[in-house]
Amino acid sequence: MALLALSCAGVALGWGLPALMGALASTSLLTLALSRQSAPATRDDGPQPTSLEQVSPSQAEPILAEVTSEAQAAEDDEIQVAEEVVTSATTQDLAEAVSAAEEVTPDGLALTPAEELATDVAEEPPASHLDYLALAERITNAGDPVPELKHFVGDIRTREAESEHHPSGAPSELERYAARMLEEAGLFEADPKLPSLTAVQLKSSHLIYLRCKEHNLPYLAKLRILKLESAINAIRFASISLSEDATQEEAYQLNQGLARSIVAQARPIDEPLDSPDDDNWPEGEWSVRYGISQTIETIQLPYRLSARYRTNVADGNVAIEIQLTPAEVFPSSCYVDGLGIVPTTGDMRQRASADYALRLALLLAASAFRCSERIRHVWVAAVLDTPSRRNCYYCVDFDRWRFSRIDLTDLGDLTETYRSFAPLMRYEDGWLRPVRQSFHLEEERFCPSRRYVPVSLSSRRLDGHVAQSLGTNHVSGLAIEESDSRALVASAIMLRLAPEDDAKSTQKNVRAVMELAGDDPDPTVREAAERVVRGLVDGSLHADALTIGEEFVRGDELTRAIDSAKALIMQQKPGKARQAIAPLLARMDEAGVYADTPSVVYRFFSSYVERALYNRLHADEEQRATVMLVPDAYYEAHLLVSVTYLMEGQGEQALAHAERMVELAPLDARARLHIVKCLEVLDRDDEAIEQLRELLERAYEPQGAGYGYYRMAFFQWKQGNVNAAQACYKSAMHLIPSILAVMSMEMSVLYLQNPDMVQDDMEPEAIEGILRANDIPIAPTEHTCELFYDCARASLDAEIFPVARNFAHIMGSFMGDDIIAGVIRSLEDEPDH
């Protein structure tokens, strides 16, 4: 008899979102208490099903248990399965759970006196048992998991064949189940040939995914990979949920029940979602997208979940598109009451696929509704992409009022559940048939075009927590492109140009330019219009649309001079390069064109993140002064002039232009690194180190911080601080692995020169301690992280998508978090106008 063992399992679920795993058997219930935060729940068995396709939640009530853990545990520990009392459960709760488990036999009936006597003399479990944790470790550490899986199955079958002569080495029933699942998944099949794979264990759900680097993967190979993957996870569920002496039949029942119990993981839609934030921010785009992504990454599912989604919280809409799990991925055998383990037919797999897809939609819709009370509608579509076609199998609009009336713990007849939502669906004889997809993710109702209005041209105001977090009360206060207004007018002009073969094209084009730009309030637009008109009239400007557009936006004298200077620098002619731009730059600076005043400051920003962080760090200053943007050409001109001076060894002159760059762009890592180079040439190492400290104190992205540590390592080494240099090298390697080879060579020299001073194994804690001891900031600093997170969330809640995408991508590169990656994927691209 296989009795349930109460056990604790730590599974990382991000910032505390609970995930429920249903463990159901067709003829017995084997429960697993996996929660640190709540007592195990128990339910009674329902009527016995007669076949796989006849199983329903009303016939077999699943027993569910929460799977929770701290996020840190996910990074360090494997799932620990141990027979111990759940510390957070009350004595009464545990007593009830144990009592319920002890009253159930594998047949779901109360023990008779004879059976009680039989249990007293039950056989010892076999010496061999299924060690899933060891298997997971082997395949995730292997270069290719397939040979390891073959060795695993081969060992089981060998011991099975020798069991008559060596009974002590006979594989357990769960081992036989594991071998059968992998064999039926095509592990030993030669065709289709599998590419080289890697097995990864997801941090949030601990499920195993098989990944390959090939993009053009044959469809049949894809199906085989997905089936192998699902077989591995079926082994996982059986291993962590069942006792060592469980039978193959019980393992089949468990996984069949799990596939039909996935909706039981959903919590009531009005139950507040665990939030990573401790503040009182209103629910918005950030919390909804994060919540949906967290659900996708943490729920326990028997098959890989591939889903895309879009949200429009302001209008109460969420759209989700699921990739249907193909019927070919479902198991090739199943347990049927009265028949035992039998092969599945194509019809049975199609029915199972349809049933699973319908339940998955309910689970995801429930999770989306729970993210915010503002969500009123969740659209879900299931599609399947094959080599020849893309089919949609259902489209349904779940509204919050009707959905709240569904009993997610007892769905009953799925067709009745769906009927109230009037879905676009053909559900015939348990099969889903293709239908026309009635909505698409990129529609205006899910992706409003207002989100991509050019930031510098927006007239929208901001208030409340959004304005405070972004350091501005209007969207245009996040602008970074000085040329936006010219680019917008240039686009309009290009659409109005006359055909080149028109005899009066010049006259018509001049009129179009003057009508659209002649009276523009922006002086740079009027100047560009005059420049283009002169070129059209004297014939120096070709009248095709692209040429005119380029001239309008980038045709100023300084930009043209910079293009020439770059070519001369590449030819190692720094003097001539400087002569091309220095006079123009000097004339601007002497005239004070971009000089700061008490009411206006001129700045350059390389990214929206940089602008938002600048707003926050300089909020007090900007209350008194307006920030104006300098042209990219002006900033670049100072850089090129400084470079030409460095090429000629004139450090002081180079430093003057580098200081102007830092004044214009105080958060730009390039400016800081360049001024460090100038100070190095002048042997002013202490000042260079201070500049690097300033860079690291404000670094917000991996590349800037990484190069900051790389340069700091050089100066620490130069001053004899070997351990500090080593710590900086280690930090840089972590942040910018692209230059790992260069840094490794330099570290080798450092080790050879200082064999008695370097530390062989410098752990992260030791690195932090050394950096702090040498007054070197640990980038990104806690203050920078707080500002960054506030700005990221505010920009998404305010639906300023050019800014939000910038923040999200940098956050993803720093964190490497699957949930954040999901948020990034949910941000739609700019619509094509």
Give residue ranges: language-model regions.
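Alpha-helical linker/edge segments of TPR/alpha-solenoid repeat scaffolds
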Residues: 522, 533-544, 551, 605-625, ...
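"A position-specific structural signal for the A-helix of alpha-solenoid helical repeats
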Residues: 527-532, 544, 556-559, 563, ...
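Boundary/linker segments of alpha-helical solenoid repeat arrays
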Residues: 101, 105-108, 112, 130-136, ...
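Long, charge-dense low-complexity segments
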Residues: 12-22, 26, 30-70, 75-499, ...
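TPR/TPR-like (Sel1-like) alpha-helical repeat modules
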Residues: 585-586, 694-697, 722-741, 747-755, ...
